[in-house]
Amino acid sequence: MERTMTPIKAAIIGSGNIGTDLMIKILRTGSGIEMGALVGVDPASDGLERARRLGVFTTHEGLDGLRRSPIYKDIGIVFDATSAKAHERHAEQLRQDGKRAIDLTPAAVGPYIVPVVNLEENLNAVNVNMVTCGGQATIPIVAAVARVAPVPYAEIVASIASRSAGPGTRANIDEFTETTARAIEVVGGARRGKAIIVLNPAEPPLIMRDTVYCLALTQDQDAVRRSIHDMIDRVRGYVPGYRLKQEVQFEPLRDARAVGGEEDGPALKVSVFLEVEGAGHYLPSYAGNLDIMTSAALAVAERFARTLIEENA
């Protein structure tokens, strides 16, 4: 007789754009995971109001309010979509309470996670960090290049619609660049990484666009191209709006040192141009920067949930 598996209940701290979009995704498409609570600090926020209409438990008293609620004992996974400073406070309390934390801020208390690159080796982590929207969009490309050739240097430029950048994003610009650059190295495999974010004020708003530059110590363009296309297909498994804007560009170099590399010998400058269109669950389609964060976080939560369900079976 087949056993019915009970989904893992999740709570989301942060009732802004990211938290609300994540809630809608879980309600519509979540696998092995279900909404338990949406937590905010403003009782009149659109996110909390929408959650109440959808029958989701809410509190406007932050993490303390969630911890006092009767539903807290049933929560297995907690998403934090607040701010880096707030998550630093939340992380220790969640750890003490035995809750798995998925951090959507740049706090980086736990290991960086990009689902298609390093999720499987971090399934036992109690707190994981989703890097940044720019990191989720570009680190898979850096990793795709790095798995076929050494990458002494990688640089990314993330351009997002100004209208999609809420107060949390704007308050965390410095943390965004620092966290993304570090994750390009730690997760992407580049020896040195650099990140730039651009808030595009264009009206009507443009969808997220990302540029990735890698210095690769190889001349095998076909191997690099195949690896990049394979990685893009894998990311599209959870972010359907993720795509190449144009074909991968290569510039052969006689000597890597001419462009800042430490090794002599032939190399390639690899340029990859991406765009990310949002699914439109709660946010407009131009907010691909927010959609890729919530989609990646949900992919991590679903994998964690399968692990927890198997352990409880």
From Swiss-Prot:
Alphabetical UniProt keywords: Aromatic hydrocarbons catabolism, NAD, Oxidoreductase
- What's an example of a GO molecular-function annotation for this chain? acetaldehyde dehydrogenase (acetylating) activity
Catalytic machinery residues: 133 (acyl-thioester intermediate)
Q: Please name the CDD domains in this protein's record.
A: ALDH_C (cd23933)
Establish whether keyword Oxidoreductase is in the entry. yes
**Chain positions recorded as NAD(+) binding sites:** 15-18, 164-172, 289
List the catalysed reactions.
Answer: acetaldehyde + NAD(+) + CoA = acetyl-CoA + NADH + H(+)
Per its record, how is this protein called by name? Acetaldehyde dehydrogenase
Q: Which organism is it from?
A: Rhizobium rhizogenes (strain K84 / ATCC BAA-868)
Biological classification of the source: Bacteria, Pseudomonadati, Pseudomonadota, Alphaproteobacteria, Hyphomicrobiales
